[in-house]
């Protein structure tokens, strides 16, 4: 009598039948599949011992069931992406979820480096400065009417230029004769003292501090001999070819102010009418 050779699960004889040997003993094919086979995540059927099995994360699939959920293309030998538990071929994923580069018009592939600004997307290598055409990457940039400029190019193209040195003004500055100047460039033509923040005047478009202008161009007071600049609302009196500060225009004898009063010239001096009538 022959030795028993039965299935470890159903105990039916395996003589003359196909079986599969395991560490637990031999199994007939139906019992093996029912005991050890995984269930396909797509069709919910067992993946038999004679089927090619594919798995992704903790899910198992028949080879024929491992497909793009949109176009049904087999993903067995294709790159794919999982989106919200759905398997998608790269073409379908790009069509549904990827954006188009605003520069070259090509698809920005999943996982590639990109930049987004103002609702638009660029490949990293396509996001260029409109001036120097170098990639902007993570550098600061300035948008202008649909163009994008790195800071140096924007300043070179649009920033105002100093009337003296012709270099761009990136911050601050002063205005003189409706033109922009660097604060350090607006200096007195005479002594080179910075004029920003202080009172100054000009001659033939050249700026001068009050001191230099007075020394170089202003008439001198016939009394105190100091320059009469007329700046800051300062008033003065002129008579013939002589000039006086208001505060200096007084009688040479009694020192009475002659502003708005009659006076009598007496050589290099001026006298009030009283002193003139009194005689020498």
From Swiss-Prot:
Give all residue intervals belonging to the LIM zinc-binding domain.
40-92, 101-153, 162-212, 221-275
Q: Where are the zinc fingers (C4-type)?
A: 7-31
Q: Name one GO cellular component term.
A: stress fiber
Q: Which residues carry this modification: N6-acetyllysine?
A: 157, 235
Q: Name the predominant localization.
A: nucleus
Any one GO MF term held by the record is: actin binding
Name the InterPro entries on file: LIM_FHL1/2/3/5_N, Znf_LIM
Q: Which domain of life is it from?
A: Eukaryota
Residue(s) carrying N-acetylserine: 2
Which terms are listed as keywords in the entry? Acetylation, Activator, Cytoplasm, LIM domain, Metal-binding, Nucleus, Repeat, Transcription, Transcription regulation, Zinc, Zinc-finger
Q: Give the quaternary structure.
A: Interacts with SOX15; the interaction recruits FHL3 to FOXK1 promoters where it acts as a transcriptional coactivator of FOXK1.
Name the chain's protein.
Answer: Four and a half LIM domains protein 3
Per the UniProt record, the source organism is Bos taurus (Bovine)
């Amino acid at each position: 009598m022959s030795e028993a050779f039965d299935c470890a699960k159903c105990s039916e004889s395996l003589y003359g039948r196909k079986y599969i040997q395991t560490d637990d003993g031999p199994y007939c094919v139906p019992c093996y599949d029912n005991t050890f086979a995984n269930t396909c995540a797509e069709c919910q059927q067992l993946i038999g011992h004679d089927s090619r099995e594919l798995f992704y994360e903790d899910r198992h699939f028949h080879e024929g069931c491992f497909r793009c959920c949109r176009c049904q293309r087999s993903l067995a030998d294709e790159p794919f992406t999982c989106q919200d538990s759905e398997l998608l071929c790269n073409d379908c994923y790009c069509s549904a979820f990827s954006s188009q580069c605003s520069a070259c018009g090509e698809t920005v592939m999943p996982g590639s480096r990109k930049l987004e600004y103002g609702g638009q997307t660029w490949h990293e290598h396509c996001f260029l400065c409109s001036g120097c055409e170098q990639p902007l990457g993570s550098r600061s940039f300035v948008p202008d009417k649909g163009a994008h400029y790195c800071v140096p190019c924007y300043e070179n193209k649009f920033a105002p230029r100093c009337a003296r040195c012709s270099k761009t003004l990136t911050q601050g500055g002063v205005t003189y004769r409706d033109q922009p100047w660097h604060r350090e460039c607006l200096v007195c033509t005479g002594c080179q003292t910075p004029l920003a923040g202080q009172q100054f005047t000009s001659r033939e478009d050249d700026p001068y501090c009050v001191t230099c202008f007075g020394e170089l161009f202003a008439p001198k007071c016939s009394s105190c001999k100091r320059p009469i600049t007329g700046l800051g609302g300062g008033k003065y009196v002129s008579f013939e070819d002589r000039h006086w500060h208001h505060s200096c225009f007084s009688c040479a004898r009694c020192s009475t102010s002659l502003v708005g009063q009659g006076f009598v010239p007496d050589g290099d001096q001026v006298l009030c009418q009283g002193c003139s009538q009194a005689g020498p």
